[in-house]
């Protein structure tokens, strides 16, 4: 059990989870690596005057999913529960939006909630891109055993644009949606999310 910054009710919350009064449904907002030395920021930590981001755009889970998957103990978005869930995905693009209706069923023995997460991957392009980028998420209602709920995951296609700071694409200081394929992954953490859709951007666009 990982309980961070619980505040004055943190102890009560932990007790409720440990005794089974509530079913845990929290998710990691960071990556837990094998060792502190696995984080690229470690060697630059402690300067009182400057912060050095050696990892550049690959901050947090973006670094591990792109360059060091084998160094991850618990991936971004991971979380345990006293129950189990199954889900089905119906993805589509309408106009300038991606939408997925995710039907989640509690197939375990305890009442609980689940968080559905959507990530994207830009295949190719002139700009550097992480292997995974969180773009949307949603949470079910509290589900009794064998009960289902549909979570609507939605985001604008332009949310997958990247910032071109030096004009690599010919569009300096702009958010650019490069032409090419964008794979969209849906799941319950960054590592287990499965590819559910491939979006084709036919022309580079400034967003």
Regions found by a protein language model. Name each.
Residues 113-117, 123-129:
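Surface-exposed turn/loop modules enriched in turn-prone residues
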Residues 126-170:
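Intrinsically disordered, low-complexity Pro/Gly/Ser/Thr-rich segments with frequent PxxP/GP/PP motifs
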């Amino acid at each position: 059990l990982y309980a961070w910054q619980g505040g004055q009710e943190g102890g009560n919350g932990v007790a409720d989870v440990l005794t089974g009064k509530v079913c845990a449904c929290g998710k990691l907002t960071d990556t837990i690596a094998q060792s502190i030395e696995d984080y690229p920021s470690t060697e630059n930590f402690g300067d009182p005057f400057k912060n050095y981001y050696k990892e550049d755009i690959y901050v947090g889970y973006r670094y591990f999913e792109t360059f060091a998957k084998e160094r991850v103990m618990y991936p971004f978005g991971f979380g345990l529960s006293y129950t189990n869930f199954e889900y089905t995905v119906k993805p589509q693009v309408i106009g300038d939006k991606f939408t997925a209706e995710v039907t989640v069923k509690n197939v375990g023995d305890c009442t609980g909630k689940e968080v559905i997460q959507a990530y994207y991957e830009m295949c190719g392009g002139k700009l550097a891109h992480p292997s995974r980028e969180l773009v949307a998420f949603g949470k079910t209602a509290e589900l009794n055993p064998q009960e289902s709920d549909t979570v609507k995951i939605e985001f604008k296609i332009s949310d997958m644009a990247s910032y071109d700071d030096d004009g690599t694409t010919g569009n300096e200081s702009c958010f650019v949606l490069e032409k090419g394929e964008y794979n969209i992954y849906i799941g319950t953490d960054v590592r287990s999310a499965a590819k559910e859709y491939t979006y084709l951007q036919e022309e580079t666009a400034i967003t």
